[in-house]
Amino acid sequence: MAKTGAVLPARRNRVLLALTLALTVLAGASSSEAAPPSPPGPSKPAPATPPAASGASALQGIPGMDFSALSPSAQHELATVLSDEFCYCGCPHTLGQCLTGHTGCQHARRMTRLAARQAAAGVPATDIIVALSEYYASFRAPRQKLEVDPRMCMGDAKAPVTLVEFSDFECPYCGKARPVLEAFAKKNATKVRFCNVPYPLPMHPNALPAGQAALWARDQGKYWEMHDALFENAHRLSTATLVELANKIGLKGAELQKALQAGTYAQELEKYKSMGTRANIRGTPSLFFNGRFNDVQLGLTEEMLSHALEDETTWRANNNAWAAD
């Protein structure tokens, strides 16, 4: 360890001399002319015009349509859609051109309202364009043949549109969709026949016996009562709960337990699962309007369902084509 001691006289003199020379150099430097300041760097470019402004201006002047309620970012995304996407009626114009130059085209207005709802929900323009393209392409795609027991349907059997939902009783998204779909079906009972098909997913172990319980209740005349009870108890669908729910809706839980143990409805449920697989179901809930897959990425709201119903009705009324404006 180094120890602290007195500095020797000769060494002290050398230190003082070095300090004196250093101070002399510094004094000379301070007396010399200061170097000219560096030229200022290039000025920063002015901030780019916010996308919102260009979006808002692009949406102005469209006859009969007002998008001022949309946020600036949503207006920008919608403006991009209008400039990049073509009208689904088949005319050689973008949506924006069709709205301003072909004002009689009702298709462009409907398509724009659909895009505006997506933009308002925060969906970027690229995703909106993909969703719109897939939605309108679905009308020309081959329809799926879906055979559902009429006891699993509600509404007029002669309704022009049949809406089939494939759902999993443990699926949280299906649970959220249930009240929306049922309200829509009841509101449009003469226009829509709504059918539900159990489609248990592999990751939901209790969805399989729950689906069998629904089919069993159907044979007792209470499919929809069991359907609703299952969704309301989706977090606890053990066999004991299924028996409890059967008793609660006025059926004999002991009989349901026997049916589950015997696998009475396993084969029929497998048939519905196979039907969904053939229809290329990618998840639940999956909706089909007259056999046409209606992707829920556009939203599963009563407004969107009404939009799809109107489109399906228009398509059918024009012999499976879009009317030319």
Predicted regions mapped to residue ranges:
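A short beta-strand-turn-helix
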Residues: A74, L146-V161, K186
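Bacterial N-terminal signal peptides that target proteins for export
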Residues: K3-L17
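Immediate flanking context of iron-sulfur cluster ligation sites
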Residues: P72-Y88
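C-terminal cap of thioredoxin/glutaredoxin-like
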Residues: T162-S167, Y173-K186, V197, V243-D325
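N-terminal "domain-start" segment that seeds a small globular fold
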Residues: S54-I62, A137-M154
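Structural alpha/beta surface segment adjacent to cysteine/selenocysteine redox centers
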Residues: V81, Y88, T94-A119, F169-E170, ...
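Signal peptide processing junction and immediate N-terminal pro/mature segment
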Residues: G28-K44
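Bacterial N-terminal signal peptides
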Residues: A18-G28
